[in-house]
A protein has these predicted regions:
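Active-site-adjacent betaalpha module
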Residues: 1-5, 33, 40-43, 69-186
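A short alpha/beta connector and helix-capping loop motif
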Residues: 2, 6, 19-51
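Acidic-leg catalytic submotif of subtilisin-like serine proteases
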Residues: 6-12
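Active-site flanking residues adjacent to catalytic metal/cofactor-binding acidic residues
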Residues: 9, 48, 148
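Short acidic, Gly/Ser-rich segments with clustered Asp/Glu that frequently serve as metal-coordination loops
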Residues: 12-18
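Active-site loop signature of alpha/beta-hydrolase-fold enzymes
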Residues: 14, 53, 153
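Glycine-rich, phosphate-binding/catalytic loops in enzymes
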Residues: 23-26, 63-65, 137-139
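Acidic/polar short surface loop at catalytic or gating sites that assists cofactor/ion binding
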Residues: 54-74
Length: 186
């Protein structure tokens, strides 16, 4: 197994701000743990951003989805989609930033890492973009450590449900804490 990559899923204002309809109440705790992990993965960090699908490219249910959430139907350059300060030093240090108009980011991640990587996954929302990235990655042969205390769900109940589901996929997926990763990232 190759050296692990840290993946920070969607650390953006839209998912972190308390005044955002999609703001995670669990983000502050996850953010602190992400900040702790970032220096450990210098040169091997991927940061993802969710951006809305372009109006002419909304296949199938994406049109209905964007109609249901009009506050998020904005230009991808809107400050609502900006990454948060916690990841800016990593970006300045060379972290790869990938954008995707989908919940899952596996396709964009594997384009950076190559096939069958070891991923240490953090971010928001555990019950949406994190799980939608982790399960296809596991299916493709990636080894994944989901850092439970560095992920933020849309609610505590949804967080636990998503972690329970991802925990059903050993050995492809294991659930670890920030402390576990700091002791031994592999």
């Amino acid at each position: 197994v190759s050296e692990p990559w840290l993946v920070v899923i969607d650390p953006q204002r839209i998912f972190a701000a308390p005044d955002s309809e999609w703001g995670s109440p669990l983000w502050p705790g996850a953010e602190a743990n992400i900040a702790t992990l970032l220096p450990r993965f210098s040169g091997r960090t991927i940061i993802t951003r969710w951006v809305p699908p372009a109006p002419g490219r909304r296949e199938g249910s994406w049109s209905a989805y964007m109609a249901a959430w009009p506050f998020a139907d904005r230009d991808p350059a809107d400050p609502l989609f900006d990454v948060l300060d916690v990841v800016r030093p990593a970006i300045q240090g060379g972290a790869v930033v990938v954008d995707a108009p989908t919940f899952g980011k596996w396709e964009q991640i594997v384009a950076v890492t190559g096939p069958a990587p070891h991923l240490v996954v953090t971010g928001v929302a555990t019950d949406c973009c994190v799980i939608s990235t982790v399960l296809p990655a596991a299916d493709a042969g990636a080894t994944i450590s989901v850092v439970t205390d560095a992920c933020a769900g849309s609610s505590l109940e949804h967080q636990q449900a998503a972690l329970t589901v991802m925990g059903l996929y050993p050995p492809q997926v294991d659930l670890r804490t920030t402390e576990d990763i700091l002791r031994s990232p592999v």
